[in-house]
């Protein structure tokens, strides 16, 4: 054991010495051999692929640029009318995100030419408002909290300053170190998106994305080789730390992206464990589309006199300015049948994401839509490799409709999404904001349509008020009962899918009848005793249940009393549980003997027998 440790230490030391020697040799070589006309101040090795004319031997000098230039960026370039920045530790810049004219040219910032060139190749020539407001204090090394609406460019806001500093650091100290920057994200999709932004903005940097669902051995080997930027989810980061593969002792920059979601999904303890392992001398930044007050306790503990850059302020509007919101009433049995007309009318051949509450709905709806459209499903039960292929196909335009659960609601930056359809009311306003934020990104236009039932009208008004956006009501689309038969089993015929009254602002958005949904003769997503998406969002129904997956018999997923596997957990509980009630098991029954009654009549076949047996 001791021999192995000593051997690895000697290997790391050899890597560092070799890297430093090569850096020194290259610097001296090019200082002596470069023509006088091209020689300026100290050369910096940054990994650019540019080849400078006049170098001898016809050798392509990878990683050479001649001067990164001073940081020629002044506060006056940001502090414009309506976009002022105060000198206090909390800077409110949220009067208007559109103020600032055409933005600030990236080529005038004095940052590394590599970054300017890389961003220009992506068509990014000017900074968005949050990037303008964040850049100078980030370059100064300030800890900060950045708040902006979804889709306003938060990633580049912290990415540009960090990348520029790492490039300059590498020019002086060489390569072969532990990561200098750590970015934490709540989901693997967001982590991959952030890592992609870093990689494309600075091709010379070594970046890695750390998340579960992929072989950990490959990530360990890449870390052993050496990286500049590590982006990952807290769970995988801690796993690699415990294995000794990830050394955070040299981290100079740490970023928490979508920090509010990080804490809400249960990563609070993991995040604090990671932050405790970081060097005290570092720059810490936190970015999020929303900033609940309770997140302040985290900033007080781990951030040093943080600056707040607030591009939202007290504004009620939580969506980007380019998004138009619509709503439409549809009965549960006909809801799936109107997706096609909505896509045809509002997406106009462009990209569309349809958000469902459950993985089964995503599968079945995508299967049904595939008869008329190019469509794929995306959810947590799909393997990571298939998810990546699906997203790549969607980005590249191989299909134009993506039916997804909330796994795609945060972090996915798919360009030119024209339409978002909420197949059902989301659990809360924040989910609505982040789903809708997949369109109208980076100043583009987009639309979002919310489908709801008649008894959910009050919930729609609450969303309107909390989001700060008035919905335009679309005329109802007539659906013949026969044409909707192919969609039976997706929802039910007995009312709203989110049962329960609006007893508090955080409850589910639904009427008091508790009808509809997935299983149970009177239920939906759970009554007061049955579970649902969580007990907080349960309603008045007593027998519904998207609850625990208890087993009454090997033949079905229904259970009369499956509360032992549910209780207070997110999908648990109640007296009915299961994907159906005690009389409607079978594989994936989405209704009961009194709801969908899809067995034998649905094109999907046999999803609702009356006696706990399969029927095909």
Swiss-Prot record:
The UniProt annotation puts motif Q motif at: 104-132
Annotated GO molecular function terms are: ATP binding; ATP hydrolysis activity; mRNA binding; RNA helicase activity
Q: Where is this region: Disordered?
A: 489-616
| Motif DEAD box, residue range(s) on this chain | 257-260
Q: Which SUPFAM superfamilies match?
A: P-loop containing nucleoside triphosphate hydrolases
Coiled-coil spans are none
PROSITE patterns to which the protein is assigned, alphabetical: HELICASE_ATP_BIND_1, HELICASE_CTER, Q_MOTIF
Quote the biased-composition stretches of kind Low complexity, using this chain's numbering: 532-568, 578-587
Q: Where does the Helicase C-terminal domain lie? A: 338-482
Q: Which Pfam families match?
A: DEAD (PF00270), Helicase_C (PF00271)
Keyword Mitochondrion present in the record's keywords: the answer is: yes
The chemistry this enzyme catalyses reads:
ATP + H2O = ADP + phosphate + H(+)
Could you tell me which residue ranges the Helicase ATP-binding domain spans?
135-309
Q: Give GO terms for biological process.
A: Group II intron splicing; response to cold
Here the transit peptide covers 1-81
Q: Locate the residues binding ATP.
A: 148-155
| Family matches, as Gene3D superfamilies | P-loop containing nucleotide triphosphate hydrolases (3.40.50.300)
Protein localization: Mitochondrion
Its domain description in UniProt is: The Q motif is unique to and characteristic of the DEAD box family of RNA helicases and controls ATP binding and hydrolysis.
> What is the protein named?
DEAD-box ATP-dependent RNA helicase 53, mitochondrial
Q: What is the lineage of its organism?
A: Eukaryota, Viridiplantae, Streptophyta, Embryophyta, Tracheophyta
């Amino acid at each position: 054991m001791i021999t192995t440790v000593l051997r690895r230490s000697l290997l790391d030391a050899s890597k560092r010495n070799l890297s430093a020697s090569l850096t020194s040799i290259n610097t001296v070589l090019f200082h002596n051999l470069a023509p006088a006309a091209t020689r300026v101040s100290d050369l910096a090795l940054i990994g650019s692929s540019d080849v400078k004319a006049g170098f001898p031997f016809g050798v392509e000098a990878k990683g050479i640029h001649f001067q990164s230039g001073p940081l020629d960026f002044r506060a006056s370039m940001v502090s414009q009318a309506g976009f002022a920045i105060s000198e206090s530790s909390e800077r409110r810049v949220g009067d208007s995100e559109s103020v600032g004219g055409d933005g600030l040219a990236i080529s005038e910032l004095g940052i590394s030419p590599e970054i300017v060139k890389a961003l220009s190749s992506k068509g990014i020539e000017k900074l968005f408002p949050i990037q303008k407001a964040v850049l100078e204090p980030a370059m100064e090394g300030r800890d900060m909290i950045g708040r902006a609406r979804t889709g306003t460019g938060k990633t580049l806001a912290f990415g540009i300053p960090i990348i520029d500093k790492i490039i300059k650091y590498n020019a002086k100290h060489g390569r072969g170190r532990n990561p200098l920057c750590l970015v934490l994200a709540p989901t693997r999709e967001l982590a991959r998106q952030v890592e992609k932004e870093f990689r494309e903005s600075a091709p010379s940097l070594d970046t890695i994305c750390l998340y579960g669902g992929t072989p950990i051995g490959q990530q360990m080997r890449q870390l052993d080789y050496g990286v500049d930027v590590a982006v990952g989810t807290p769970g995988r980061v801690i796993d690699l730390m415990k294995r000794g593969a990830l050394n955070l002792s040299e981290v100079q920059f740490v970023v928490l992206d979508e920090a509010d979601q990080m804490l809400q999904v249960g990563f609070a303890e993991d995040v604090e464990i990671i932050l405790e392992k970081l060097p005290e001398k570092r720059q810490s930044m936190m970015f999020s589309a929303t900033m609940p007050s309770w997140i302040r306790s985290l900033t007080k503990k781990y951030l040093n006199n943080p600056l707040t850059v607030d591009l939202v302020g007290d504004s009620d509007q939580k969506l980007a300015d380019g998004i138009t919101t619509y709503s439409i009433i549809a009965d549960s049995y006909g809801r799936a049948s109107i997706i096609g007309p909505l896509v045809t009318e509002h997406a106009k051949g462009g990209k569309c994401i349809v958000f469902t509450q459950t993985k089964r709905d995503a599968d079945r709806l995508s299967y049904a839509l595939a008869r008329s459209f190019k469509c794929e499903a995306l959810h947590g039960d799909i393997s990571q490799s298939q998810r990546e292929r699906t997203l790549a196909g969607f980005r590249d335009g191989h299909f134009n409709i993506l039916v997804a659960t909330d796994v795609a609601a945060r972090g996915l930056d798919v360009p030119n999404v024209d339409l978002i359809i909420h197949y059902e009311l989301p659990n809360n306003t924040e989910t609505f904001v982040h789903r809708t934020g997949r369109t109208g990104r980076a100043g583009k236009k987009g639309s979002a349509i919310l489908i709801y039932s008649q008894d959910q009208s009050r919930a729609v008004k609450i969303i309107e008020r909390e989001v700060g956006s008035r919905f335009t009501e679309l005329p109802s689309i007539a659906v013949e009962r026969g044409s909707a038969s192919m969609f039976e089993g997706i929802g039910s015929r007995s009312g709203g899918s989110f049962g329960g009254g609006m007893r508090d602002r955080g409850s589910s958005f639904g009427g008091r009848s508790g009808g509809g949904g997935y299983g149970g003769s009177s239920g939906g997503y759970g009554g007061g005793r049955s579970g649902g998406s969580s007990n907080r969002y349960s309603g008045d129904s007593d027998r519904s249940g998207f609850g625990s997956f208890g087993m009454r018999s090997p033949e079905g997923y229904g259970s009369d009393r499956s509360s032992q596997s549910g209780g207070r957990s997110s999908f648990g509980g109640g007296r009915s549980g299961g994907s159906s009630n005690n009389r409607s098991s079978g594989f994936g029954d989405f209704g009961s003997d009194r709801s969908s009654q899809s067995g034998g009549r649905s094109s999907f076949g046999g999803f609702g027998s009356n006696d706990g047996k399969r029927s095909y």
